[in-house]
Amino acid sequence: MTTTKVNHKRAVLRLRPGQFVVTPAIERVAIRALRYLKSGFPVHLRGPAGTGKTTLAMHLANCLDRPVMLLFGDDQFKSSDLIGSESGYTHKKVLDNYIHSVVKLEDEFKQNWVDSRLTLACREGFTLVYDEFNRSRPEVNNVLLSALEEKILSLPPSSNQPEYLSVNPQFRVIFTSNPEEYAGVHSTQDALMDRLVTISMPEPDEITQTEILIQKTNIDRESANFIVRLVKSFRLATGAEKTSGLRSCLMIAKVCADNNIPVTTESLDFPDIAIDILFNRSHLSMSESTNIFLELLDKFSAEELEILNNRVTGDNDFLIDNSQFVSQQLAGQPN
């Protein structure tokens, strides 16, 4: 991902395809979202924290192959943070003494208008990714209504520019938001939601999470699957379902992969890493969380032992069958 300087020194992003993990579940959501975007409709990705909304939004923006403006919702935002404001002055002074007996003096002060991200994206036809837009107050986001529906952006009166900006046909917006029960999140006005195509982002399935861990941390598949199953079981047992477990999985997997820590129940270090990362996401007491976690480790340890026994039994059966086959072949050979 690189930044490029454009009008008024505003930085835009030019995305480079990264390690975006594509599984059937993710691909279905991405295809749906791209259909709406290519038809000119803004897309709203809604879901709990950690479900990959921002990552998918950046992937969709990359697929549109246009420069990207990235904007993060903020409770302190004002309308000027979206559309721009007058910043600084230009001082022009002209002294005309062409006729020596006549002195003409012109002194002019003029305010400079600086576009903000929304205005620049509307003017140039960029893709705007508005991350966690419902952290901004609803009245601030009202400036989006006319831009999305009538394709006209209303600007404050200024001597340097017109009061209305016609939106570039290539302008696209991708919104992301967290549930309203999250701290610091505002209710979104119905008028804005009515203009968006909202896609609910579910918790990534085990296959998707496993593939993400493998590609992002270079951990082996068996260890990645073990971490995903352990984190999912712990979250279900403790009722910590408000957020996604994907971030926890990534943190555990990266630490284990970077420090060559075995991902097994017999490892001395792995349980400590899992406890440090998982327990602060649980609303239960330390003793309750510890009891649940130890029970899960015992359960997973028994499962590992059963799998190992099945493998050994299968290998022994293969050796016995192979030995019998060889004996039969030797018995059938002529002396």
UniProtKB/Swiss-Prot annotation:
Its main location: other. Keywords: ATP-binding, Cytoplasm, Gas vesicle, Hydrolase, Nucleotide-binding. One of its GO terms (molecular function) is ATP binding. Signal peptide: none annotated. The keyword Repressor does not apply. ATP binds at residues 47-54. Its EC number is 3.6.4.-. It is an enzyme of class 3 (hydrolase). Pfam families: AAA_5. GO terms for biological process: gas vesicle organization; ribosomal large subunit assembly. It is found in: Gas vesicle; Cytoplasm. GO terms for cellular component: cytoplasm; gas vesicle; preribosome, large subunit precursor. It catalyses: ATP + H2O = ADP + phosphate + H(+). Belongs to the CbbQ/NirQ/NorQ/GpvN family. Forms homodimers, probably interacts with other GV proteins including GvpA. NCBIfam families: gas_vesic_GvpN. An ATPase that functions in gas vesicle formation. A minor component of the gas vesicle, also found in soluble extracts. Gas vesicles (GV) are hollow, gas filled proteinaceous nanostructures. During planktonic growth they allow positioning of the organism at a favorable depth for light or nutrient acquisition. This is Gas vesicle ATPase GvpN. It comes from Dolichospermum flosaquae (Anabaena flos-aquae). The gene is gvpN.
